[in-house]
Regions:
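Core Rossmann-like FAD-binding/catalytic domain of the broad FAD-dependent monooxygenase superfamily
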Residues: 1-350, 356-360, 368, 477-478
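Hydrophobic, well-ordered secondary-structure elements that form the walls
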Residues: 19, 415, 448
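Short, internal strand/loop/helix patches
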Residues: 149, 424-438
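Short, hydrophobic beta-strand segments that form beta-sheet elements in well-ordered domains
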Residues: 176-179, 413-419, 429-433
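Short loop/turn microsegments at loop-to-beta-strand junctions
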Residues: 269, 438-440
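Short, glycine-anchored, charge-dense loop/turn motifs used at functional sites
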Residues: 278, 441-451
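C-terminal helical "tail/cap" subdomain of flavin- and related membrane-associated enzymes
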Residues: 302-413, 417-423, 439, 451-457, ...
Length: 478
């Protein structure tokens, strides 16, 4: 029987990111993917600032940013604009980049790290005991692993086999998707139009193709199995935007109903779920791929500690505690966007737009929404009495001639102090940054969030609490 430390089910962005996070720490990982190959066409296309920061912290952002199309403003309602340039980050934007590009970059990194990605492997059974998990595959073979993570999408086999409830609802509004070429493309990048008949959106991929998205109320009774034609998508744009922008070729199309659901649990014993297997929602706000990648970043270092034998039980428990709350907030955010844009009552939609326009003219409210949309504002729970920085995203500060996120690319914990200090460990990076506004010492988790902040005298105990027993000394100092 083939045995690995962790079996990841699903080779989408969540599964690939998780595999990279595990393999870079020496964990034996195998990815089981039901599809025979990675697709070139996909529904997701937006990467937000926090996701780009995390990719940067693993040296995978540059290629995606170079090939993507930056969007610096988002208008959730007419007259209400979120200026993403205000975000305190190196990536003040939402980057239009097809999921297929992100998957190719992640897949290449996984291959460099020696990850075994097995295609055509469908999971049909799961059993676990106190030592590990056995997966049964459709071809009759089995896969044994210390831990299993289901990153296998909204119809997750892993979640189903665990018996985890996927609570929520299906939206009633049909969504039409098509990748098209335009003879008269809009000049304003991301282009959205609304009317009483629905909403249309054009997303530039930067290679001559555009993603055309339509919520057309006149076509809500069309069967989901009915193919989307070029004439149908053109008619929707003409009816709602009064132009079809000269739509010509169409290489792909789809019709679907989106859902708003979240798994009640993200873990059962040695088995976890992440990404769309744990949460699905309206595509408005472009949160899905981002939330999944961030799930993987949160879980990866924790699982690696468990495999290494020095993770205390609370470390693995914290994955569900932290990410379930984030997933619930994402569902609330996207459901709000859905009601604002696609609600059936014209009066209610109009009232919501008036309210959101007024609220976004209040700087504090606007910055809060920008933080939620971009992921910059995510904060994990902090213990009572902990420093206010605890649980917050650590900014990409300058550290001795380089950047913090560059120092984090080996996936270790990082101690940020105002002066050089030897903490006697090789598995923790020490970075020097002088800032009167920061505490004397800050311990940054591998996923870029503050684990602890306080006085240097407490460092040894704190590092031992988070990282396990002491390792041989030779930790680099920058």
């Amino acid at each position: 029987m083939n045995t690995v430390d962790v079996a990841v089910v699903g080779a989408g962005p969540t599964g690939l990111m998780l595999a990279c996070e595990l393999a870079m720490r020496g964990v034996r990982v195998r990815v089981l993917e039901e599809r025979d190959d990675l697709p070139n066409i996909t529904r997701a296309f937006g990467l937000h600032a926090r996701t780009l920061e995390l990719l940067d912290a693993r040296d995978m952002a540059d290629e995606i940013v170079e090939r993507g199309v930056p969007v610096r403003e988002v208008a959730p309602a007419p007259g209400a604009t979120l200026n993403l340039r205000e975000l305190p980050t190196r990536y003040p934007m939402v980057l239009i980049a097809p999921q297929s590009l992100t998957e190719r970059v992640l897949s290449a990194r996984a291959s460099q790290l020696g990850v075994d990605i097995a295609h055509g492997q469908k999971v049909v059974g799961l059993e676990q005991d106190h030592e590990g998990v056995t997966l049964r595959l459709a071809d009759g073979s089995t896969q044994r692993a210390g831990y299993v993570v289901g990153c296998d999408g909204a119809r997750s086999a892993v979640r189903t086999l665990l018996g985890i409830d996927f609570v929520g609802k299906q939206y009633e509004t049909h969504i039409l998707l098509a990748d098209v070429r335009l003879a008269r493309p809009p000049s304003d990048g991301l282009s959205a139009k609304t009317s009483a008949d629905g909403v249309v959106l054009l997303v530039p991929f930067g290679d001559g193709w555009f993603r055309a998205i339509a919520w057309d109320r006149t076509r809500e009774q069309a069967p989901l199995s009915e193919p989307v034609t070029l004439s149908e998508i053109r008619a929707a744009f003409l009816r709602i935007a009064h132009t079809d922008f000269g739509m010509a070729d169409m290489r792909w199309s789809s019709r679907f109903l989106s859902e708003r659901r979240q798994a009640k649990r993200y873990r059962v014993g040695r088995v976890f779920i992440a990404g769309d297997a744990a949460h699905v929602h309206s595509p408005l706000g472009a949160q899905g791929m981002n939330t999944g990648i961030q799930d993987a970043m949160n879980l990866g270092w924790k699982l690696a500690q468990a495999v290494g034998g020095f993770a205390q039980p609370w470390v693995l428990d914290s994955y569900e505690e932290e990410r379930h709350a984030v997933g619930a907030n994402v569902l609330k955010l996207t459901d709000g966007f859905n009601q604002l844009v696609l609600g059936r009552s014209l009066l209610r939609r109009a009232l919501r737009r008036v309210v959101i326009t007024v609220l976004l003219n209040v700087p504090a409210t606007r910055h809060m929404l920008e933080g939620r949309l971009s992921g910059i504002g995510i904060r994990y729970p902090r213990p009572r009495g902990a420093h206010p920085l605890t649980g917050r995203r650590m900014p990409d500060i300058d550290c001795s001639g380089t950047r913090l996120y560059e120092l984090m690319r080996d996936g270790r914990f990082t101690v940020v102090t105002s002066d050089k200090v030897d903490i006697g460990r090789s598995d923790v990076t020490v970075a020097v940054h002088v800032d009167p506004g920061l505490p004397a010492a800050v311990l940054v988790r591998p996923d870029g969030y503050v684990a602890w902040a306080g006085e240097r005298a407490e460092l040894a105990a704190v590092v031992g609490h988070w990282c396990g027993e002491r390792q041989p000394s030779t930790n680099p100092t920058y």
